[in-house]
């Protein structure tokens, strides 16, 4: 049996640094320890691991089936699951977000490998959505458990609806599932109610106390749980960032709160002027 990995938390809310892992010696024990650590810490930092493309693919496959992206270029035709993210080609993701929540089954996890990066700057930050939910008031928690939110991509071509509160498998902890980049509307509420509530949730979850931050070095690998975190790049450098990425596909298993109330979609009264035109500048 391989020696146990050393798991050292890096922040109070989430994140842990992993040492003792070799990219060319991935066994069942190491895989089990990584999966357990990810469930606990949500983000794992593997400094200086420097895997080959094949090794990086194999690490990702420990967590489930990997996505073959339809249009982001892959690094190697032999390993189509590994795509290339180049800051000189694609825009930096400097808004707090969870990836592709406009999908019917958003990803379970994601991995990044820093291939080329600046000497300093260009850090990445993550937020713990479980801690975010825990700190909400009890009345608001009760209200949120019966609500959903529609998410769409920036072009509006893809749309999905998800519960605002999700349950973490294995622990039963609840997490908030909205993000500023893709979350658009709470259909059970009027438009102004939805706008005000989402604005509050966005502000609440972006508090620094819920976050961790990683200063990249070439060769670093980061793995994170996409279901209960948000992330954002710190856009403070113009130097190139070249990363390899792998994404663990989601499944259709429901993470909704069991027995949560079900509310119908809000219907505005178009037979009344206030409902048709809105009042006070609001569109209902």
Functional labels for PLM-detected ranges:
Residues 2-221, 226-284:
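Non-heme Fe(II) oxygenase catalytic core, chiefly the N-lobe of the double-stranded beta-helix
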